[in-house]
Structure formats: structure tokens, C-alpha cells
A protein has these predicted regions:
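Active-site-proximal C-terminal subdomain of hydrolase catalytic domains
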Residues: 420, 433-437, 886-997
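Eukaryotic all-alpha helical interaction scaffolds
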Residues: 35, 55, 59, 99, ...
Length: 997
């Protein structure tokens, strides 16, 4: 057996002749490798076959058998690249048999290492082969066997470790486990040595495919560009052409069909010349889809038939089924329903047999869409209800599975991008429910949609202790996902009950990336019947597609036990194309209802609101525009906006019910859980009366409610149970409140920022505002205040209020926390509400999860939730470090912007998660009193922001904080309607809202 070691991957050695077996074998191996680099696979295979023939003529011995195994492994590699899967399988099996035959032969330490290396290569090649032919369980078993062999192999640079990890990434992609694949690939990329010149570009390509397949096209192109640079550096012509096909696939998903057609045609020509028929079949499949889009039915059918034939010849059963599904769509487009059903069922049978459950969901969604399309085209008469029922029985379980796929992603950004793809299926479901006029189903759909994801602290990896052997090759955690039809030869697969394990390095990367979430709890619709929202559809989805849709834990859709003192209506809104609304009454009133606002009207009204508010750019410029031209600064334009919003998002029937209840039982409380699209709507301001200037706040008190997932019967050891009816209770009556302390964080001085800078003072010089000084003095007179101050002025612009101080103050116990200062909201398009931050006196050396800003590290919602779990092996969750008191006020720019996100884990929700019962926060960027003075010409003696701070403080001291704040807001509204003075503009006071669970 040869006694020198080398990396035998095609690109991870070099083309120079390496002394291994002697001539002519060494020079022949170098020549074949050159052919492979040049993508001349036929020539490379011919050289290997000649060498194998020569080796078989040499007298048999363990060394000769090893040489033959080496040559067969190389032949298998070339055949795999050429997608000659039958010949590749034969070569792999023969190589493995030869290696097994000499396993017990005497060999020195170096010989044993060479045998192990060749065995690993053969196992990885076999796993690749099994994956390509759809035998995914066998492929995983093969990788597991390789992992068992790996510790014995001397791999100081981690080349084989990274190669094994790459194969796991490919298998996760094949299964559609996009989240787990992304985690593992990212972790591998950060740990793979630069000498792994073959593995690195393939990892980059894998990450690009993951991003493209989940709707993140710019990051995908960035990964592809980096991969291209690496491939050009090694001269890998063949892989560059494969990259071209991946870019074509991305262009197709992005909707750039002309570019996709051009790139696929170029790649197809190359693959056909090189006889890489599997890659050619993938291109033909995609080109068939493109031909169908441009109306070339003949071309689409021809390309589909060619792709299907090639996949079947190669034994790529799942890819063949994908092409059948595409053919089924073409058959439907030309009116051949029988052929559509035949092909769809045949594809589904393959997916079912291979346990590719998510692809089964894609078939079911396609069938449901065809039923809806047929309903739109033809009159089903008496059979329409049956047709709609059939479509719903297919679409709703599949849509639930598709939506639930997001829980495998490690970041909220990736999950939000995935939801943009998955929402199309849920919009279909809502359309069908409306068509069936099923108010009960619509109610349950909205309840499930509004339940919200659950924070999965138990899945948040903590920083691992140093490991001597590392774990870069460990597989990613389960995160099944599905591809959106049609996706060229992208197969999906998943086992809910068989998660792989996230290794230490991958765990660390995941913790740095973002929050982990889990499915929402079951929403119990009735205490008496025990019915769970969508229970039969959830059961069908979990049975058909083997995916967890909801958590085992149940929560009531609304806790009404303590709501007997006044009538209360819970309103929830959900986005599904149109805006869907449900409401139900309690507290002495009974009834429920549903409604919906057409998407165009809602979008138009929301755009008008956005134009009236401070813009998304620099805060100063946005506020300047709001004062100069915004509708909120003139009573007439403000009323027109409030009326437009009411007509678009508020049901007239609900207004009528509120009037009836109010006349009979007194002012009701309206609890509103908005959808992300309408989360900035100032509900109090809605002009609900077409004949007068009556507003919703004239009829009722209004409070915002958090997603149901925050309402858990057993919140665990990290937080105090949140009390749903806390808006009616005296904080002193809470059994968990054992202190009278009020924690005040008032305009803290931020390191590195002067008073007149972007993160400078929001309240002005300490001691300059008599109203604020009087407010602090009243708190000092009433009881304990933290920080301890001798005079009210000392409470402002302090430099010692950092996160450690805040932790100590909150751990000692408090009944209230009031923060007035800078808040930086997370960009909605990023999808990560947990990136919202408040600004304390923390310097750059402070440990935390937010990036530093100059010489300052902000405190993020992610910090408040995860605490130090991602930073230390002995880390604590945020609820232990910063336990929130019952009432919290966060008066800063868009501090309550959480609900604008699909996953609400911003500052306000973090406080509720950490134990708060009520959080007062703001819906949009707040103008300071200084802004009113400079931009609106208000006298310096009038300080609107100070008045708002005092109003919130008074409300939090009241037994009914929502009612007290509402009275102040009605007073402001009355002034606004009577005199129209800018200090009474809703631009400030309508931003305030109380949020409860």
C-alpha cells in the first residue's frame, strides 16, 4: 500500500505528478485530474478505465487491490459528475468491496490512514449517489457510517470533516430542510480551512441555493459571486457551468424569466456536450416551465417529456416526479383534466413512497388551485359547495404545513422571507373560506393566524465550552421546509420525529444569528367543548405531511374569567391578501362577528397613514416632513385620513354593536390585536361615524393585545405569569408585587453622543422643564424611586444607568418601570423585530447581542429575551436578568413597533415575556418638544412631549391605566377638534398605546 498521503479530491490536490503507485499510474492519475478540471469527463473516464485495466492485469495483492479501489472511486466520482448514476453505482460498490476485502490485511499506520481515507471517499460518493436517486434514508445511513469512521482518520486540516459536512448540507437541501441546511453550511464555511479549495465554493453555492429557494435573492447572488471567484481560481470549468444553472434557477424564482431562459439555454448546451444528462434534465425541466409561461405549450410539453425521460433513465425518481407535476400543470392548462389527474397522482405516489411528504403537499395545493380555477370558470351549480369543500380539504392542511416550515430557520429574517412565499397558499385558503361563506372557519383561521410563534428558549444554543476535537461536521437541527412549485428538481423530504443534532460550532453560529421559535400553541375555542381552532385540519396536516403544526400546549383564545365588571370586545385582524377581522364579546355582552377589507382599499389607506407619519429615513428629516406636509398636522386632513382608515379597516357592524352595548352597559373596552399591515393604525382616532366627527375613542377605551403565544398557563421558571385582566387591577393588589419601587430611566446620557447629536437629549437640559421636575417630585413624595436622587433634576441625563444597573434594580423588585429616551426600531423589511434597541449608558465593552454604535452598545430586545444564553455556557435567560415589573412604559420612537412584524419579539413584547402585565409604548417615531418648537413654531413654554410623559405616568399610577390614558387622549382630541393647535395634534398623543397579553 502506498506510504505517502495526499488529498485525492479533484480540486484539493494539484495536477502535478505525485508519487503514489509508480508509473504509469501516477502520471495517469495526474492526467485524468487535468481532464476533470477542464470538464472533459469523457477523457478523464477513459484514462481511469485504462489504468484500471492495467491494474487488473497486475498480480493480486492488498496493495494492488487498494490501487483498483482508488481507481474505481475516481471513476465513480467522474460518473457522478456526468450523472451516469448506474455506472457510478457499479464503480462505488466495486470499490467498497475491494476496500472491505483488505480491511484486515496487515498495514502500517500510514497505510491504515490511506485505507480510511479511501473508505471515507467511497462512503461519501455512495451517499451522494443514494441522495441523487431519492434513497434518502440510505444516504443518511451512509453519512452516519462515515461519521463513525471519521474520528479514527487523521484529518488535521479538517478536509474530510468539511466534505462530510457538505454532504450533510446537500442531504438537508434535498429534504427541503432549508433552515438546518443554512445553519450547518454557515458554520462549516466559518471553520473549513482555506486549503479545502473544492469544498468552499460548493458550500457557497449551497448557501446561494438556500437563499434563492427561500426568497433571499441578493444574498444568493453574493454567495454565487464568491463561489465564482473561488472556482475561477482553481480553473474548475465544469463547476462554473453548474453555477450558471444555479444562477438561472435564481433568476427564474426572482421573476427575471428572460435572463433565466438565456442562462438555462447556455448551461443546457454545455451539459449536452459533456453528456451530463442529469444536469441537462434539470435545465429542461426549468425551460419547460418557462415555455409554459410564455404560452409555448408545444415546447413546454416537449421539454417536459425530454426531462422526464432522462430522469427515469437515470433512476432519479423524485426529480422525475417533479417533472410529472410540471406536466400535470401543463395538462390542466390545455384542458386535459384526465391527464392532469393521472400525472399528479403518479407524482404523488412517488413522493409518498419516498416519504417526501412536503412534495405531497405541493400536489395537494396544485389540485386545490385547479378546483378554485375551475370554480371561477364554470358554474358548478348544486355541486359548488362540494367542490369548495374538496378544495379546502386539500388546501388548508397543505397551507398549514407550508406555513409551519418556517420554524426550521434560525433567523426571523429567513422566516419572514419564507412566509412571503408561503402566504400564497394561505390566501387561497381564505378565498375558499369566503366562497363557502363559513364564518366559523374564518374565525378559526384568524385565531390560528394571530396566535403567533412561540419563543423557543429551550432551542436557543448557549455558548459551548471549548472542545478539543470540534464538531464542525455535525448536522443541523431539524428544520423541514418545502419548495414553492415549480422549483427545478429541488426535492423535499422530512422526518418530524428524527431530528439531527446541532453541533457546537453550528450551535454557536445559530445563537449569533437570531431567535429560535417554535409552533404556536393550540388555541382552545371553547372551554365547554374543548374544540381547538382548525383541529381537524391540523390533524390532517400532521398526519399527511409529518410536520408539527402546533405545540402540544393549549391556551384559551381569550381569558374572560375576570372580565365581568364591564363589556369587552376582542378584535383580531389577519393579513391574507384582504384584511380579515374577527370579534367576540364578553363581560356581560355576548356575540361575535367577522369581516374583511379588500386589499386595495386597505393598502391605499395604510399608504396614506404612512405618508402622514415621520418617514422611514433619518428621524429628523422624517419629522420635518410630517410637520410640513403630513395629514396629522391639520384637523381637516387628519379627519379625512381617519375616515379613510375607518372605512378600510373597521367593520360598520362592530361600531353598531359598540353603540348598542355602550347604551345598555356603559363604555366598553376594545382589545385589538392588529395584523402587521395595520399595526401603526391609531385605532382610537378612527372616524367611525360617517355623519359626524365621532371617533372610536369617543365610544370606547382601546387597548392593544399581544399574540396568544405569550399567554401560557405555565410560563416556566423565568417569568411571572402575565395577568390578562391587568388593565383593571390595582398594581398593589398583585400577589407578585412586594415593593413600591418605581424605576425611572429618564433621558440617559449615551456614551459618544452629545446632547445635540442624533442620540442626544430628548427632554432638554436637566432642570429646565418644571412639568417634568414636578412629575419626578411627585414620585419621590409617593414612595421609593430608583435611582436614588436628592433632587428631581438628578434623575435626568444620568451617566450610570447601564444594563447592569437596570438588572440590579429590577431584580430587587419594582412595581413600575418608566423609560423615556431613544429607541431604535428594527427595519420591517428585515423581519427581525428583536433587533429593536433602547439606549442606556452602556459603553462598547459591555457584553451584549447588539452591534456597537460608536462607543455605545445598545440594549436590544434580543438581549432582553435571550439574556446571556448565547454568550456564556452558564448564561441566563433575559427574564432572569431583567425581570419586568407589572407596568412598563417605553416612551421612545416606535417602541411598540413589534406588531408590524410577522414575529413580534421587539421591546414591548420582550417586557411582556419577562413578566410585565401592561406596557405603554408608541406606534411610530415621536417628535420631541424641541421639534415642535423648531418645526412648528410652538413657544418654548409649551412642551407636548413632557405632557405626554406625565400623562403616561399618571395612567400607570391609576387602577385602570387604559381608561386613564384614554381620558387624556380624549381631552387632547377635544382640544384638537376645537382649536386645531399643533400641540394637540394626534401626531404625538395618538402614537401612545397600552399593550397587554
Amino acid at each position: 500500500m502506498p506510504e505517502s498521503n495526499r488529498e485525492d479530491g479533484v480540486h484539493e490536490g494539484n495536477a502535478a505528478v505525485t508519487q503514489l503507485y509508480g508509473e504509469p499510474f501516477d502520471s495517469g492519475l495526474a492526467l485524468a485530474e487535468q481532464h476533470q478540471l477542464a470538464a472533459d469527463l469523457t477523457a478523464a473516464c477513459a484514462v481511469y478505465e485504462q489504468l484500471l485495466t492495467l491494474a487488473e492485469s497486475v498480480e493480486d495483492s492488498p496493495d494492488v487491490q487498494f490501487l483498483r479501489a482508488h481507481l474505481l472511486a475516481n471513476i465513480a466520482s467522474v460518473r457522478l459528475t456526468a450523472t451516469d448514476l448506474v455506472a457510478a453505482e457499479d464503480a462505488v460498490e466495486r470499490s467498497r468491496a475491494l476496500l472491505d476485502g483488505i480491511a484486515s490485511a496487515p498495514m502500517g499506520p500510514r497505510g491504515r490512514q490511506l485505507w480510511l481515507e479511501m473508505t471515507l471517499r467511497t462512503l461519501l460518493a455512495r451517499a451522494d449517489l443514494l441522495r441523487r436517486t431519492g434513497r434518502l434514508d440510505e444516504a443518511l445511513a451512509c453519512l452516519d457510517e462515515a461519521a463513525l469512521r471519521l474520528p479514527e482518520f487523521d484529518d488535521p486540516e479538517g478536509l474530510r470533516t468539511s466534505e462530510l459536512g457538505l454532504n450533510r448540507v446537500h442531504l438537508l437541501i434535498e429534504r427541503g430542510e432549508w433552515g438546518a441546511a443554512e445553519e450547518l453550511a454557515s458554520a462549516l464555511l466559518s471553520t473549513t480551512p482555506a486549503t479545502a479549495v473544492e469544498t468552499i465554493p460548493r458550500l457557497l453555492i449551497a448557501l446561494g441555493l438556500i437563499c434563492a429557494s427561500t426568497g433571499r435573492f441578493d444574498p444568493a447572488e453574493d454567495y454565487f459571486a464568491r463561489a465564482e471567484d473561488a472556482l475561477r481560481a482553481t480553473g474548475d470549468t465544469g463547476e462554473l457551468q453548474s453555477l450558471l444553472a444555479h444562477r438561472a434557477y435564481t433568476a427564474m424564482l426572482r421573476g427575471d424569466f428572460d435572463l433565466a431562459e438565456q442562462l438555462f439555454a447556455e448551461a443546457s448546451a454545455f451539459f449536452e456536450r459533456q453528456r451530463q444528462y442529469g444536469d441537462l434534465a434539470v435545465c429542461e425541466q426549468a425551460r419547460a416551465f418557462l415555455a409554459g409561461r410564455r404560452g409555448d405549450s408545444t415546447g413546454a410539453d416537449d421539454l417536459t417529456a425530454a426531462s422526464l425521460s432522462r430522469f427515469e433513465q437515470l433512476g432519479a425518481s423524485i426529480a422525475a416526479a417533479d417533472t410529472m407535476l410540471l406536466g400535470a400543470q401543463h395538462a390542466y392548462d390545455r384542458g386535459d383534466i384526465t391527464e392532469m389527474q393521472r400525472l399528479a397522482q403518479k407524482a404523488r405516489d412517488v413522493y409518498q413512497a419516498r416519504e417526501v411528504h412536503e412534495r405531497c403537499a405541493q400536489v395537494d395545493l396544485m389540485l386545490a388551485r385547479t378546483i378554485e380555477d375551475n370554480l371561477n370558470r364554470t358554474d358548478h351549480g348544486d355541486h359548488e359547495r362540494t367542490s369548495v369543500d374538496n378544495a379546502l380539504s386539500l388546501a388548508l392542511p397543505a397551507a398549514l404545513a407550508l406555513e409551519a416550515a418556517r420554524y426550521g430557520f434560525a433567523t426571523a429574517h429567513a422566516r419572514s422571507q419564507w412566509l412571503e412565499l408561503a402566504d400564497d397558499a394561505m390566501r387561497l385558503v381564505f378565498r375558499l373560506a369566503v366562497r363557502r361563506q363559513d364564518q366559523g372557519l374564518l374565525f378559526e383561521l384568524v385565531e390560528h393566524r394571530c396566535a403567533g410563534a412561540s419563543l423557543a428558549l429551550d432551542r436557543t444554543p448557549s455558548a459551548p465550552p471549548p472542545s478539543p476535537d470540534g464538531d464542525a461536521a455535525a448536522s443541523g437541527e431539524t428544520g423541514e421546509s418545502v419548495s414553492v412549485f415549480p422549483s427545478a428538481a429541488m426535492k423535499v423530504y422530512g422526518h418530524v420525529d428524527d431530528p439531527t443534532t446541532l453541533g457546537g460550532v453550528a450551535a454557536d453560529a445559530a445563537a449569533a444569528a437570531g431567535l429560535r421559535v417554535a409552533p404556536p400553541p393550540k388555541v382552545r375555542m371553547s372551554q365547554d367543548s374543548g374544540r381547538v381552532a382548525l383541529q381537524e385540519y391540523i390533524a390532517a396536516a400532521e398526519f399527511r405531511y409529518h410536520r408539527r403544526i402546533v405545540d402540544e400546549e393549549e391556551v384559551p383564545f381569550w381569558i374572560t374569567d375576570d372580565l365581568t365588571s364591564r363589556p369587552v370586545v376582542q378584535v383580531r385582524l389577519a393579513d391574507a391578501g384582504d384584511l380579515f377581522i374577527t370579534w367576540t364579546w364578553a363581560g356581560g355582552a355576548r356575540g361575535f362577528g367577522t369581516g374583511h377589507g379588500p386589499a386595495e382599499e386597505v393598502d391605499r389607506a395604510v399608504r396614506a397613514l404612512a405618508a402622514a407619519l415621520p418617514g422611514p429615513g433619518a428621524a429628523a428629516e422624517g419629522i420635518r416632513q410630517a410637520f410640513a406636509s403630513g395629514a396629522m398636522t391639520d384637523p381637516r386632513t387628519e379627519h379625512a385620513l381617519a375616515r379613510e382608515l375607518a372605512e378600510a379597516v373597521w367593520p360598520e357592524g362592530l361600531t353598531a354593536q359598540i353603540r348598542q352595548v355602550s347604551a345598555r352597559a356603559g363604555r366598553p373596552l376594545v382589545r385589538i390585536q392588529p395584523s402587521p399591515r395595520v399595526a401603526q393604525v391609531p385605532w382610537e382616532l378612527l372616524a367611525v361615524d360617517a355623519e359626524s366627527d365621532g371617533r372610536l375613542i369617543d365610544l370606547a377605551d382601546v387597548v392593544t393585545t399581544a399574540p396568544t403565544s405569550l399567554r401560557r398557563p405555565d410560563p416556566g421558571p423565568y417569568q411571572r405569569p402575565a395577568l390578562d385582566a391587568g388593565v383593571h387591577r390595582d398594581p398593589a393588589a398583585s400577589p407578585d408585587t412586594d415593593t413600591d419601587t418605581v424605576v425611572l430611566v429618564l433621558d440617559p446620557r449615551i456614551p459618544g453622543f452629545r446632547a445635540d447629536s442624533p442620540l442626544g437629549s430628548v427632554l432638554g437640559p436637566p432642570g429646565s422643564d418644571p412639568e417634568l421636575l414636578a412629575f419626578v417630585q411627585s414620585r419621590l413624595d409617593a414612595g421609593a424611586v430608583v435611582p436614588s436622587v436628592a433632587t428631581p433634576a438628578e434623575a435626568f441625563r444620568r451617566t450610570d444607568l447601564d444594563r447592569d444597573w437596570l438588572s440590579g434594580a429590577l431584580r430587587k423588585g419594582a412595581r413600575r418601570l418608566m423609560y423615556v429616551g431613544h429607541v431604535s426600531g428594527a427595519p420591517v423589511e428585515g423581519g427581525q423585530s428583536e433587533d429593536g434597541t433602547l439606549h442606556l449608558c452602556c459603553g462598547p465593552g459591555t457584553a451584549g447581542l447588539a452591534e456597537t454604535v460608536r462607543t455605545h452598545r445598545p440594549l436590544s430586545a434580543k438581549d432582553l429575551l435571550l439574556g446571556t444564553l448565547p454568550l456564556r455556557a452558564d448564561g441566563e435567560p433575559g427574564a432572569r436578568i431583567w425581570p419586568a415589573p407589572p407596568r412598563v412604559a417605553l416612551i421612545g420612537c416606535e417602541s411598540g413597533g413589534d406588531l408590524r412584524f410577522a414575529e413580534s419579539f421587539g421591546l414591548a413584547m420582550a417586557m411582556l415575556h419577562n413578566g410585565a402585565e401592561l406596557v405603554t409604548a408608541t406606534r411610530w417615531v415621536l417628535p420631541t418638544s424641541f421639534a415642535f418648537h423648531r418645526l412648528a413654531g410652538l413657544p418654548e413654554s409649551v412642551r407636548p412631549l413632557s405632557a405626554a410623559v406625565v400623562a403616561v405616568d399618571n395612567a400607570h399610577e391609576d387602577q385602570d391605566p387604559v381608561g386613564r390614558l384614554g381620558r387624556w387622549q380624549r381631552e387632547q382630541l377635544d382640544h384638537w377638534r376645537s382649536d386645531g393647535r399643533i400641540e394637540h395634534s394626534p401626531l404625538l398623543w395618538a402614537a401612545m398605546t397600552c399593550i397587554v397579553v
